[in-house]
């Protein structure tokens, strides 16, 4: 891909994020899971089923973000500002509030749904949740830096979604702010500067993709590419939620 000037690259990234936001609206916000959850009609046991799988997912996806530091190190060595910001973001995931990091926050929210560490760490994920994770894993090791950081556009939408979930859980499902801390923390970490100056993850992802475009290093593979990877990762989040409902019906947590 040819190098873009700063204004063109910024506009390209903004247009991509607008497409991702629209797809999230269609596949996640307007999906059955979120419609029922937002209305307070989703049984607590069904959300617990989702969170058992999602908790396991978060542990593994954070390790992939750490691996991206090594995988794309030649690029980051050219851009010490981004290298420092990514190092900060990775450290944030693993040392706050204390090692092993955000996993402790996730387990606090899991406990509010009666889930144990063993439930999260020792039970297999739903196939669709595993599929989302393994799409990211394959893209990290087989894809380009631009494809990876386009996939990471989902982090901005997840941050917004986490804020919505926090509001729903604390107003309609009786969770305390401390019990719902996984969602408030991720809303903050993804969208805001936090923990003594750590850049919001979404801002870092935008800046990295923009720099790849500006330097002519935003390479894409046939049948993959920047837009496909961004939108597919969003589609897979919707699929995870829908598959939770299907599993809940199989387990008779919901009426068929």
Where are these regions (language model features)?
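Non-heme di-metal
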Residues: 2-256
């Amino acid at each position: 891909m040819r190098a873009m000037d700063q204004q063109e690259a910024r506009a390209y990234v903004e247009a991509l994020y607008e497409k991702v936001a629209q797809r999230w609206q269609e596949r996640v916000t307007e999906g059955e899971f979120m419609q029922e959850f937002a209305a307070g009609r989703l049984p607590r046991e069904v959300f617990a089923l989702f969170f058992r799988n999602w908790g396991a997912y978060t542990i593994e996806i954070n390790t992939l973000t750490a691996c991206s530091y090594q995988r794309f190190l030649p690029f980051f060595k050219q851009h010490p500002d981004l290298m420092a910001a990514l190092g900060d973001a990775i450290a944030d995931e693993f040392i706050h509030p204390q090692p092993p990091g955000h996993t402790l926050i996730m387990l606090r929210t899991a406990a509010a749904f009666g889930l144990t560490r063993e439930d999260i760490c020792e039970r297999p994920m739903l196939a669709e949740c595993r599929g989302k994770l393994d799409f990211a894993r394959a893209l990290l090791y087989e894809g380009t830096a631009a494809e990876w950081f386009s996939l990471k556009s989902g982090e901005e939408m997840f941050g917004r979604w986490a804020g919505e979930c926090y509001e729903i859980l604390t107003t309609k499902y009786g969770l305390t702010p401390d019990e719902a801390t996984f969602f408030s923390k991720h809303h903050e970490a993804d969208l805001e500067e936090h923990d003594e100056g750590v850049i919001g993850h979404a801002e870092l992802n935008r800046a990295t993709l923009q720099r790849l475009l500006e330097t002519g290093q935003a390479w894409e593979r046939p049948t993959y590419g920047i837009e496909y990877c961004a939108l597919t990762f969003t589609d897979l989040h919707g699929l995870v939620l829908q598959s939770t409902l299907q599993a809940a019906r199989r387990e008779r947590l919901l009426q068929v």
